[in-house]
């Protein structure tokens, strides 16, 4: 994963006649549905939206949680306590096949799409490492560089049966010419210590890809924008029954009684909110499409005049957070030569 040292630093605004240059950035959220069990078609769909967003001047394009590979809303995978189900195993095999390696050919293609369209791209994806899946966010630069990734630290509810947990080694905030860019996935946004870690890294463009289309979610996004003094971009899929595989067990029947082709399964709600708590675009609960806003990075300083949660409004003498950024590995192999060298250094 590239470190922020490889990135261009934020350009300092030099005042001219007492007025700072423009700090306006156009940002776009893509609210759309995965093409389930067809990753190439999903990336084709993503590219069309990226081209459209770029043609309208977007400099940053954000996609929802698990867009590539698919958020498995209502999928059963044969899960029940103490029960092993062959049909569930087969479904997981299909889901695993739709996930992508990072890095890998799909990542290379996305990097090229970002380059061709001159945008920063933040993409939700299901990543596979061996036979463990992770809910991941991928970051790309307009130069076609894969910057790195964030793996979801804590899958929610039954997500824990199919996704592994990320660790502290993948919680980046990238210092870019359009602002400091990072992400928290879905209900990670309810983890105050994780949010604090992102604030401490100086996040300015807070991307929140999610599967939560509830109206209550909007309150969380508004709070985070004010608490963090940052722009919040929350991207959620808009999905209808027709977007899912044609099999009744793909959806929990007690959740979705309406099996009509056009019935809404995930209602979106993508939204862009300023550090001052102003809703700049969205929420869109109606359809697939783009949610776009022109943001003024100067609003960050305006907001932090009164409240900076990790700066002048913090009390490190009373409350202090330690973040472990070391990769967490289940197995570490040590050769005899390495062990001998380690022993000689003691």
Curated annotation (Swiss-Prot):
Ranges of residues in domain CN hydrolase: 25-297
Cysteine disulfide partners in this protein: none
TM regions (residue ranges): none
Molecular function per GO: indole-3-acetonitrile nitrilase activity; indole-3-acetonitrile nitrile hydratase activity; nitrilase activity
Active-site residues annotated for this sequence: 65, 152, 186
Its EC number(s): 3.5.5.1
Modified residues (N-acetylserine): 2
UniProt-listed GO biological process terms: indoleacetic acid biosynthetic process
Family: Belongs to the carbon-nitrogen hydrolase superfamily. Nitrilase family.
Physiological role: Can convert indole-3-acetonitrile to the plant hormone indole-3-acetic acid.
Oligomer and partners: Interacts with DEK3.
Protein name: Nitrilase 1
């Amino acid at each position: 994963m590239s470190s922020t040292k490889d990135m261009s630093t934020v350009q300092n605004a030099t005042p001219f006649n007492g007025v700072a240059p423009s700090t306006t950035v156009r940002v776009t959220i893509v609210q759309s549905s995965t093409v389930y069990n067809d990753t190439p078609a999903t990336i084709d769909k993503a590219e069309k939206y990226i081209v459209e967003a770029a043609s309208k001047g977007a400099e940053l394009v954000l996609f929802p949680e698990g867009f590539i590979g698919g958020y498995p809303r209502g999928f059963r995978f044969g899960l029940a306590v103490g029960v092993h189900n062959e049909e569930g195993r087969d479904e997981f095999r299909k889901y695993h096949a739709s996930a992508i390696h990072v890095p890998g050919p799909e990542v290379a293609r996305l990097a090229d799409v970002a380059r061709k369209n001159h945008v920063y791209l933040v993409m939700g994806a299901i990543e596979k490492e061996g036979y463990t899946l992770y809910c991941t966010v991928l970051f790309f630069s307009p130069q076609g560089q894969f910057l790195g990734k964030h793996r979801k630290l804590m899958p929610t509810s039954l997500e824990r049966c199919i996704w592994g947990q990320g660790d502290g080694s993948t919680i980046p905030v990238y210092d870019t010419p359009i602002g400091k860019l990072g992400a928290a996935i879905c209900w990670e946004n309810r983890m105050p210590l994780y949010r604090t870690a992102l604030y401490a890294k100086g996040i300015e463009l807070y991307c929140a890809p999610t599967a939560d289309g509830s109206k209550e979610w909007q309150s969380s996004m508004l709070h985070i924008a004010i608490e963090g003094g940052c722009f919040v971009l929350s991207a959620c899929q808009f999905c209808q029954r027709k977007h899912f595989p044609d099999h009744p067990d793909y959806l929990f029947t007690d959740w979705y009684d309406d099996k009509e082709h056009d019935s809404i399964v995930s209602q979106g709600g993508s939204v862009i909110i300023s550090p001052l708590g102003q809703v700049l675009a969205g929420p869109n609960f109606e359809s697939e499409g783009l949610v776009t806003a022109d943001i003024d990075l100067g609003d960050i300083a305006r907001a932090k005049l009164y409240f900076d949660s990790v700066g002048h409004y913090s009390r490190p003498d009373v409350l202090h957070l330690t973040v472990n950024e070391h990769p967490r590995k289940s197995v570490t192999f040590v050769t005899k030569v390495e062990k001998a060298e380690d022993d000689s250094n003691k």
